[in-house]
């Protein structure tokens, strides 16, 4: 009943209160709500990075910072690196954190290192299987967080 109310069903309607096939009606409404939430989350996720993406990128001779373009990018990153960044989609969509990727310049599509930013600060830098970054990667991310991130966040 709460799901029906949330979707603005007529709560005086016998069809809403007493559907012929209650379980099927429940499952159908659940799928619809999940689809709507998924679409809203994907849209909110894309909006987070629309203004940020161009301003947040940084490239050196060996490394680059890139922003994800869609929610599937976080899932792919987590699967490839065997860590949990794929579970951060809703946090990013709710603007509780940002996720950016560190890539090797010669392999820009291959997941390498993932960075979490919260409240304008680096919270995590993780490689494959939650490994710590190399000194080179840490130095690059530190440079990015000092020189690029503050301006990117202001513009976003």
Where are these regions (language model features)?
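Catalytic-core elements of nucleic-acid end-processing and repair enzymes
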Residues: 1-156
């Amino acid at each position: 009943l709460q799901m029906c109310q949330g979707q603005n069903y007529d709560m005086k309607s016998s069809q809403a209160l007493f559907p012929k096939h209650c379980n099927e009606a429940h499952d159908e409404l659940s799928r619809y709500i999940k689809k709507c939430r998924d679409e809203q989350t994907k849209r909110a996720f894309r909006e987070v990075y629309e203004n940020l993406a161009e301003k947040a990128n940084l490239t050196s001779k060996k490394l680059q910072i890139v922003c994800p373009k869609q929610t599937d990018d976080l899932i792919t990153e987590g699967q490839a690196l065997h860590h949990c960044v794929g579970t951060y989609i809703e946090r990013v969509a709710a603007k509780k954190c940002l996720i950016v990727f560190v890539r090797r310049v010669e392999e820009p599509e291959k997941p390498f290192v993932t960075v979490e930013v919260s409240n304008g600060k680096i919270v995590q830098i993780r490689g494959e299987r939650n490994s710590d970054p190399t000194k080179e990667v840490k130095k690059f991310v530190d440079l990015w967080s000092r020189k690029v991130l503050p301006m990117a966040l202001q513009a976003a």
